Amino acid sequence: MLMTTNEPVNAGDLAAREAAALYRLMTWLSPAFPVGGFSYSSGIEWAVEAGDITDTATLADWLDTMLGDGSGFCDATFLVQAYRATEAGEETSLRDIAELASAFVPSRERQLETTSQGRAFIDIARAAWDAEGLDAMVAACRTPLVYPVAVGVVAAMHGVPLAPTLHAFLHAVVSNWISAASRLIPLGQTDSQRVLVRLEAAVAATATRALSATLDDLGSATFRADLASLRHETQYTRLFRS
């Protein structure tokens, strides 16, 4: 039953909650948060060597496709579903989401990438940003949490709103992709920012789709990117772990 109240919302309390949520998101999804994202390229390293990515235009096109038709949308959807299951206290649903998210990863190195970051995110959250009930929700999953599921669980346990959490997560993922590419192509700082600007609409569109998606909407059509993550495993000279 929906409960309503005529009591006014205290603007000061609302501003404080919004500031606290923003502070947490900026901390958790900052490059300084030690989840090790800098050591992974999500297959971009192989794509650069193969000549698929050579400049800002080809990088922006590659990442736009990854966002809308590949791991970007899938990870965003898993984050949303994990957040909602955690918020509702649905441990069985969360376990199913965590297992499916892990199974959806297309290669061994991408599995290493997302599970190691997820584990680090949860470990640091427990140590420095703990929340009542977090341990129980993580334990209920009975499987290592991939990165987007870990972010969704922690954000929900802290009461950080879903929409900004999702946008911040996608921004962080895209920024890490661009950072990896900037070292490989290479790109200057200004060109890297130009790519980020070009992807602003794609990030927003991916987040909007994920917020209304269900697990039945999951799917990927980024065959070249998936192949890149597989071939990176045997790439002779590598800077990154994926």
From Swiss-Prot:
Family assignment from sequence similarity: Belongs to the UreF family.
Main location: cytoplasm
Subcellular location, record wording: Cytoplasm
Alphabetic keyword roster: Chaperone, Cytoplasm, Nickel insertion
Taxonomic path: Bacteria, Pseudomonadati, Pseudomonadota, Alphaproteobacteria, Hyphomicrobiales
PANTHER family hit by this protein: UREASE ACCESSORY PROTEIN F (PTHR33620:SF1)
Highest taxon above the source species: Bacteria
UniProt-listed InterPro entries: UreF (IPR002639), UreF_sf (IPR038277)
Organism, as annotated: Bradyrhizobium diazoefficiens (strain JCM 10833 / BCRC 13528 / IAM 13628 / NBRC 14792 / USDA 110)
Entry annotated with the keyword Cytoplasm: yes
One cellular component (GO) term of this entry: cytoplasm
Molecular function, one GO term: nickel cation binding
Name of the protein in its database record: Urease accessory protein UreF
Gene: ureF
Complex formation: UreD, UreF and UreG form a complex that acts as a GTP-hydrolysis-dependent molecular chaperone, activating the urease apoprotein by helping to assemble the nickel containing metallocenter of UreC. The UreE protein probably delivers the nickel.
Reported function: Required for maturation of urease via the functional incorporation of the urease nickel metallocenter.
